Amino acid sequence: LGATFFYLWNAFSLNKHIMNRRSFFKNGSLVAIGSTIVNPFQVFAQQTDFDTLKKNKKAKNIIFLVSDGMSTGTLNMADLFLSRKTGKGSHWLQLYKENRVTRALMDTASANSIVTDSSAGSSSWGGGVRVPNGSLNVGANGEQYLPILQKFKQAGKMVGCVTTVPITHATPAGFCVNSKSRNSQEDIAGQYLDLNFDVMMGGGNQYFAADKRKDKADMYAKFAAKGYQVAKTRTEMMSASNDKPVLGVFGEDAIPYYIDRNNDAELQKTVPSLAEMAQKAIDRMKNHPKGFVMQIESGKVDW
């Protein structure tokens, strides 16, 4: 699914010109929505051949792909956009059509609401326990649950997160830390320093820079002192060695949308894409004998 995810999101960046609305919806596109891609989890429902998937083999590496805030409607529109602009639909939906993926639905209610938020959702997905909205791996009575990336780090694997929002934001943090509040992002940055994860990249300069933090702590200097390569531009990230851990922070808050980045030559030079961050993270960790576990998040889908 790794290639699927990148293809879906990069699809929006391949074209710098926005088609007009009439052209987008003409020639039966609305019929296509109603007949073929209304719900990709229901259409093409065939029984998966688990023998073909070699279910008894153990995975060495695990990549969690998070499209935060994406509904099936978002996926449908991506497929429609690609069909109109490139003449072929999304690779993701093609996997459904060919029955090459195992798919499922889950109840995402948090411990205190039928409507979850990113922190509770990430905590339950990664840690297996429902927690109240707003908290990160902390239960209603203060119970602390070990985050999934800490478990894998203890097991000897390399671990990391890359995202288009602040690296201290709820979804990556839900795989990494314990915190009563998802809003404690300065504290979360400090926890990352103690965890010694191998790759952490996204936005969030305001939670690392001394002149932005309330406590005036220079988190960049602290990470560098622990042996991290600190990257603040695309060039610095691309030139970083694969032999040392990497902290990459490429925006004050979130990094720009693809459509904005790809229409701005300066942003293209200075800000890496999610695909580029993910590839750099994989290159950093892929040769580790015990493998790696990584979360890749497209975090601004519903912003």
Predicted features, each with a name:
Residues K16-F25, F50:
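Twin-arginine (Tat) signal peptide motif
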Residues L65, V162, G202, F250-E252, ...:
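Generic beta-strand/beta-sheet core signal
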Residues S181, T270-A278:
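Phosphate/oxyanion-binding active-site loops and adjacent basic polyanion-contact surfaces
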Residues L1-I18:
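Short, Lys/Arg-enriched N-terminal segments with co-localized hydrophobic residues
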Residues A170-C176, D253-E266, P289-W303:
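Active-site His/acidic residue clusters
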Residues S23-A45:
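N-terminal export signals
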Residues A32, V43-K244:
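N-terminal catalytic scaffold of extracellular/periplasmic and nuclease hydrolases
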